[in-house]
Regions:
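Juxtamembrane/disordered regions of integral membrane proteins
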Residues: 1-150
Length: 150
């Protein structure tokens, strides 16, 4: 695993997803204000963990880098397809994790209480995140014919 490349992929992918989340309302999807949401959730835990919106955005960036590291260590060479397709598949995994862990933790409930527009916006964002992580980090998986001894 190339940690520097994974961290860079995480930063670029998180910035890409954040940019998309900011414009989603212009295409009819609900606003997903991740920085404010994480900030509110941290403040609800205790006054010690209270952070402003900038702290929420920083936490989102850190989580984005951590997930990119997980992708690099465990998923990049195990998923099928091109680096972009592997990233898209990983984006679906991250979306499911977000809906099972982060959405309930931030008060949105499991799978955003079935709000289809919110789910669509979240899935779109995570597909962008995963696609960018896969494209920026990923190398091509060697074909079986190129393997030594083939």
């Amino acid at each position: 695993m190339d940690a520097k490349r994974a961290a860079a992929a995480g930063v670029i992918a998180t910035a890409s997803m954040t940019a998309l989340l900011m414009v989603e309302p212009s295409i009819g999807l609900p606003k997903i204000a991740i920085g404010e949401t994480l900030s509110s959730s941290m403040s609800a835990i205790s006054s010690v963990t209270a952070v402003g919106p900038a702290g929420g955005w920083l936490l989102d960036l850190i989580v984005g880098v951590v997930f990119a590291m997980i992708y690099a260590a465990y998923f990049d060479q195990r998923l099928p397809g091109s680096r972009f397709v592997r990233g898209l598949l990983f984006g679906v995994v991250v979306f499911i994790v977000a809906q099972l862990i982060f959405a309930p933790a931030t008060g949105s409930g499991f799978f955003s209480h079935g709000d289809l527009e919110l789910l669509a916006g979240g899935l779109l964002g995570h597909l962008v995140y995963g696609g960018v992580v896969g494209y920026v980090y990923g190398g091509e998986v060697p074909s079986p014919a190129a393997a030594p001894g083939a």
